[in-house]
């Protein structure tokens, strides 16, 4: 994927309402959906609780945006129109109840944490705090626990089996290094690496050098406003702010 890529970010679109044919006509090369894991509460029609889409309770396809069958249909439509399909994924945390706790809807098998997971991050330039502590009230999952890793990697396979080409990895800078390496390996194994990238925004430049397992975007300028899409120059998504 060395040519310039233009991604249409279908933020909070229902899968069966994404205008695939029109997106292709406008010159986009990929469509990115919002996360598709089930959320702790229904998403309101006016989207005043859209934040809930980033608070999953499991690692299975299906929420208010669509079912696994909707995703398969979307993938087929994308591929028929020469587009790749990217899905936003949330691996750092599961849903909370109110803050620094866990939603009662989350099953016990997903409740594996670090010793400091329920303490808020204070220093965002400290790699240990970034990866082992709570992100704004969302406790960090223990991504070195095999039950968690297996559940998440099974979710990636579900996405691949549905026709997804790659992933946008939410809160990438908050994932522990050993997990990031395994995640990159899994994406390669599934054939999803080329169209996957990690979110690393507002990170110290020195820390950015550590996030070299997969391509990144590292500033807000790569995410357009008004849900119109992100223009990402591949050659590993490099730009003036991200030479790594």
What are these regions (language model features)?
Residues 1-6, 18-24, 28, 34-54, ...:
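Active-site-proximal helices and loops of the catalytic beta/alpha 8
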Residues 3, 37-76, 106-142:
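Aromatic- and acidic-residue-enriched carbohydrate-binding clefts of CAZyme catalytic domains
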Residues 10, 61, 171:
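Short glycine-centered, acidic/aromatic-flanked micro-motifs in structured strand/loop junctions
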Residues 11-13, 201:
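Structural motif
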Residues 35, 69-73, 84-106:
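Active-site-adjacent structural elements in enzyme catalytic domains
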Residues 95-150, 217-218, 225-244:
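Glycan-binding loop/region signatures in secreted carbohydrate-active enzymes
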């Amino acid at each position: 994927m060395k040519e310039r890529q233009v991604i249409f970010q279908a933020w909070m679109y229902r899968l069966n309402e994404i205008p695939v044919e029109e997106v292709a006509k406008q010159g986009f090369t990929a469509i990115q959906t919002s996360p598709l894991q089930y959320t702790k509460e229904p998403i309101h029609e006016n989207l005043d609780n859209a934040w809930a889409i980033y608070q999953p309770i499991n690692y299975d396809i299906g929420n208010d945006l669509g079912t696994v069958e909707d995703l398969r249909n979307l993938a087929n439509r994308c591929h028929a129109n020469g587009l790749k399909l990217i899905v936003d994924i949330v691996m750092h945390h599961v849903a909370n109840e109110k803050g620094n706790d866990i939603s009662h809807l989350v099953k016990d098998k997903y409740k594996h944490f670090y010793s400091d997971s329920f303490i808020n991050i204070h220093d965002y330039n400290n790699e240990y705090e970034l990866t082992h502590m709570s992100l704004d009230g969302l406790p960090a999952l223990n991504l070195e626990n095999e039950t968690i890793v297996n559940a998440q990697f099974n979710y990636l396979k579900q996405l691949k089996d549905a026709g997804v080409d790659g992933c946008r990895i939410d809160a990438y800078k908050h994932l522990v290094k050993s997990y990031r390496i395994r995640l990159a390996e899994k994406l390669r194994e599934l054939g999803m690496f080329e169209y996957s990238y990690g979110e690393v925004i507002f990170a110290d430049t020195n820390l950015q050098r550590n996030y070299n397992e997969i391509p990144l975007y590292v500033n807000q300028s790569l995410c357009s406003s008004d849900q119109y899409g992100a223009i990402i120059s591949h050659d590993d998504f490099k730009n003036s702010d991200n030479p790594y």
